């Protein structure tokens, strides 16, 4: 009996110890899972909110420390908590409005509800369902070069158009564009006119709130003729000149002599028999897609997304910075010009097809307010609006923001730099929006200390 009793005690001890050990292990596993879940919350998230049936995208930065959340939602500072897989935070904007989030984390996705409260209408908050995924990481490896032959061309800068090619930051794309009338390098009309575009190109990791960088490494002619006209657009006419130009608007064909680098009229009038202009191939259109909530603008239009900017310094060697407002950026290029004077005064420049190569990159978490261009000698900020006055203001504000961001200048310092170094160009008068570009020679900025990449 004593031996049996001792054996029973021993067995009981072993079984009981195993149960305790198993329960303890399960508890530790649960704690580890919770810690793992919490750790996965820290980072940059892309929020897709269903706002009355329309997807709106936001960036959200979260940092978790000991159950507390910090960061920002769409740039608004947030504070909150995380308990297990449950998240709650409140973000506040400068006007006193709030975004309150209640959500759960599961399988790498945050989903729940965001309540938007406008400080001016606090009695009527709006609650919307959302999902969020961690922002994709840049692909590791050697950048790729893509040969893309377009078969479809689009006449809207739309987020709904299916991407024709997916590329990664650092990749290069070689392609072609048709002219503004839809005619290709062989003289074949491929699509209805109105600046049909090549693209859109989906750029991996580019998310709303980022900046897309497009470096034009090749902008070359691929045929020997271009079309223009003999009119002057209404913005360039006073009453007397309008009367004199009443018979204008006829199509004019130009010969493009790449061997000598000039364009000449194929059928010149008497006084223009020996007239020629230097060839300077450019792209009239470079654009990212506006957000899905916005009406898709036609490819003859322009705005903060870029578009039909018709700026004659968007040439080989230029770098264009554009805001990203939809996942993948959705980059469009087109509307090649063999040459163009400031403003595109005829309404049509020397319209032609083009051989184009570009390299893309992404600046994460930083979105430019409007199109910017950089050359070897200048930085250039664009303003595009319904009047030249408003475009002038937009260009000035765009450049002021650039100087503040890149060089940490104060507003008075910005004024001193602009007042002594600004160069203004009227870039566009032919379309709905006028364009004004503020340029600064980089030599004037050499003594300033750069604080950021752009």
Q: Residue spans of the language-model regions?
A:
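N-terminal, Lys/Arg-enriched amphipathic/low-complexity engagement segments
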Residues: 140-189
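Short, structured beta-strand/loop micro-motifs enriched in basic residues and often containing a Trp
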Residues: 149-158, 190-197, 297-305
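Short, Lys/Arg- and Gly-enriched loop/turn segments at beta-strand edges
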Residues: 180-191, 219-229, 328-338, 427-430
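Bacterial N-terminal signal peptides
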Residues: 8-21
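Intrinsically disordered, low-complexity linker/loop segments enriched in Gly/Pro
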Residues: 221-314
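Conserved mixed alpha/beta catalytic, RNA-binding, or beta-rich assembly cores of soluble enzyme
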Residues: 279-308, 312-389
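Central antiparallel beta-sheet cores of small beta-barrel/beta-sandwich binding domains
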Residues: 28-126
């Amino acid at each position: 009996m004593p031996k049996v009793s001792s054996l029973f005690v021993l067995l009981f001890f072993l079984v009981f110890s195993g149960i305790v050990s198993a329960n303890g292990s399960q508890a530790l596993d649960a704690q580890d899972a919770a810690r793992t879940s919490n750790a996965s919350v820290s980072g940059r998230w892309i929020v897709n909110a269903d706002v009355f049936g329309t997807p709106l995208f936001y960036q959200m930065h979260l940092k978790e420390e000991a159950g507390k959340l910090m960061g920002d939602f769409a740039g608004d500072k947030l504070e909150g908590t995380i308990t297990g897989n449950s998240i709650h935070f409140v973000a506040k904007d400068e006007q006193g409005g709030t975004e309150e989030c209640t959500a759960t984390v599961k399988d790498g996705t945050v989903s729940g509800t965001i309540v938007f409260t406008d400080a001016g209408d606090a009695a009527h908050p709006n609650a919307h369902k959302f999902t969020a995924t961690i922002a994709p990481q840049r692909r590791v490896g050697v950048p790729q070069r893509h040969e893309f032959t377009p078969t479809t061309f689009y006449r809207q800068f739309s987020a709904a158009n299916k991407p024709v090619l997916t590329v990664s930051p650092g990749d290069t794309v070689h392609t072609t564009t048709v002219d503004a009338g839809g005619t290709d390098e062989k003289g074949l009309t491929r699509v209805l006119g109105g600046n049909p575009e090549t693209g859109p190109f989906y750029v991996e990791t580019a998310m709303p709130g980022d900046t897309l960088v497009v470096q034009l490494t090749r902008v070359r002619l691929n045929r020997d003729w271009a079309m223009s006209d003999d009119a002057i657009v209404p913005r360039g006419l006073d009453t007397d000149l309008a009367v004199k130009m009443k018979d204008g608007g006829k199509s004019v064909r130009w010969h493009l002599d790449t061997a000598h680098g000039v364009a000449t009229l194929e059928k010149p009038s008497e006084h223009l028999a020996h007239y020629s202009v230097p060839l300077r191939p450019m792209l009239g259109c470079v654009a990212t897609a506006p957000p899905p909530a916005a009406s898709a603008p036609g490819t003859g239009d322009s705005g903060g997304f870029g578009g039909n900017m018709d700026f004659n310094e968007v040439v080989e060697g230029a770098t264009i910075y554009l805001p990203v407002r939809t996942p993948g950026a959705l980059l469009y290029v087109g509307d090649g010009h063999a040459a163009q004077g400031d403003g595109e005064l005829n309404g049509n420049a020397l319209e032609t097809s083009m051989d184009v190569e570009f390299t893309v990159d992404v600046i994460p978490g930083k979105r430019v307010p409007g199109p910017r261009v950089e050359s070897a000698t200048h930085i250039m900020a664009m303003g595009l609006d319904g009047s030249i006055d408003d475009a002038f203001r937009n260009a000035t504000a765009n450049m002021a923001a650039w100087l503040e961001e890149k060089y940490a200048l104060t507003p008075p310092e910005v004024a001193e730099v602009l007042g002594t170094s600004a160069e203004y160009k009227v870039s566009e008068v032919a379309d709905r929006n006028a364009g004004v570009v503020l340029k600064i020679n980089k030599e004037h900025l050499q003594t300033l200390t750069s604080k950021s990449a752009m």
